[in-house]
Swiss-Prot record:
Disulfide bonds join C66-C161, C106-C120. It comes from the Eukaryota. The keyword Transferase does not apply. Its main location: secreted. PANTHER family: GLYCODELIN, LIPOCALIN. It comes from Equus asinus. Lactoglobulin is the primary component of whey, it binds retinol and is probably involved in the transport of that molecule. Monomer. The gene is LGB2. This is Beta-lactoglobulin-2. CDD domains: lipocalin_beta-LG-like. PROSITE patterns: LIPOCALIN. It is found in: Secreted.
Length: 163
């Protein structure tokens, strides 16, 4: 699955801090359709490391419990692309950000793989959905093949994981 165009010249220090998962999109809805779906995660914070990697603090559902997890995304030659070992080795690509309000990123299928599942998220600094940014998110994902569904955060900003 081809990931839409990534951002040029990502400044890691500028993406540091608290974020909220506002909307999620999947090329295969089974990746998101239940609380324990493999890529249904809620990003809470991004922390750049001194080595240029990106520590991601997230919440996910596991056995009807909301679990906090820290994963480290390893830098690549492209400043907007990282690799992460999360249920297999995957590629994370930052599509766009204005640093102050929103960030769009996609998590690709396990590498190497013929799997086509991809999940993209719209992160915001606040829990309020900006309709203009939502439109921009939708446009950024147009190159994705297959049936794409946008799921706005069902928790409405309440306890992430929705139990």
């Amino acid at each position: 699955t081809d990931i839409p165009q990534t951002m040029q010249d990502l400044d890691l220090q500028e993406v540091a801090g608290r974020w909220h998962s506002v909307a999620m999109v999947a090329s295969d809805i089974s990746l998101l359709d239940s609380e324990s779906a493999p890529l249904r995660v809620y990003v809470e914070e991004l922390r750049p490391t001194p080595e240029g990697n990106l520590e991601i603090i997230l919440r996910e559902g596991a056995n009807h419990v909301c679990v906090e997890r820290n994963i480290v995304a390893q830098k690549t030659e492209d400043p907007a692309v990282f690799t992460v070992n999360y249920q297999g080795e995957r590629k994370i690509s930052v599509l766009d950000t204005d640093y102050a309000h929103y960030m769009f990123f996609c998590v690709g299928p396990c590498l190497p793989s013929a799997e086509h599942g991809m999940v993209c998220q719209y992160l915001a600094r606040t829990q309020k959905v900006d309709e203009e940014v939502m439109e921009k998110f939708s446009r950024a994902l147009q190159p994705l093949p297959g049936h794409v569904q946008i799921i706005q955060d069902p928790s409405g900003g309440q306890e992430r994981c929705g139990f």
